[in-house]
């Protein structure tokens, strides 16, 4: 086996040194990671400032607010959607479904009035 040449030894030494430096750079200091501040929406900002004073009535108001949001999103909105679907898509509309009327031929009797349909007139000059 041949030994490394001086250039190869120098290159290996530099690569090891570079690797050690890279690994050391990967360690985080006690100040890292620096995260950007969270941006709050207007409602979240309001409730955070409202609940800073932890009085019982404020907690109750917040609880009522949360329950009303739950009722609105999980009960009322689905109920409205179901009501709309039932009203406009499922229930039978008066005159919504039109059926073809049965054919009437000469000699037939109309059930509602009892009227008998008279025979058709003969038209000798026209071909049928």
Swiss-Prot record:
Subcellular location per the Swiss-Prot or TrEMBL entry: Mitochondrion inner membrane
N6-acetyllysine carried by residues: 24
Record-annotated membrane-spanning stretches: 68-86
Topology in membrane: Single-pass membrane protein
An individual GO BP term: mitochondrial electron transport, NADH to ubiquinone
Any one of the GO CC terms: respiratory chain complex I
Disulfide bond annotation, renumbered to this chain: none
This protein's UniProt keywords: Acetylation, Electron transport, Membrane, Mitochondrion, Mitochondrion inner membrane, Respiratory chain, Transmembrane, Transmembrane helix, Transport
Tree of life domain: Eukaryota
Family: Belongs to the complex I NDUFB6 subunit family.
Subunit field text: Complex I is composed of 45 different subunits.
Protein name (database record): NADH dehydrogenase [ubiquinone] 1 beta subcomplex subunit 6
Source species: Pongo abelii
């Amino acid at each position: 086996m041949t030994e490394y040449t001086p250039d190869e030894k120098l290159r290996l030494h530099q690569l090891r040194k570079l690797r050690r430096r890279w690994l050391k750079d990967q360690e985080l200091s006690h100040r890292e990671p620096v995260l950007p501040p969270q941006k709050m929406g207007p409602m979240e900002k309001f409730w955070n400032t409202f609940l800073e004073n932890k009085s019982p009535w404020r907690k109750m108001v917040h609880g009522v607010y949360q329950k009303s949001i739950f009722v609105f999103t999980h009960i009322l909105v689905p109920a409205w959607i179901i009501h709309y679907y039932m009203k406009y898509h499922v229930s039978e509309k008066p005159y919504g479904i039109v059926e073809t009327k049965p054919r009437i031929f000469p000699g037939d009797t109309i059930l509602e009035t009892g009227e008998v349909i008279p025979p058709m007139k003969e038209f000798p000059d026209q071909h049928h």
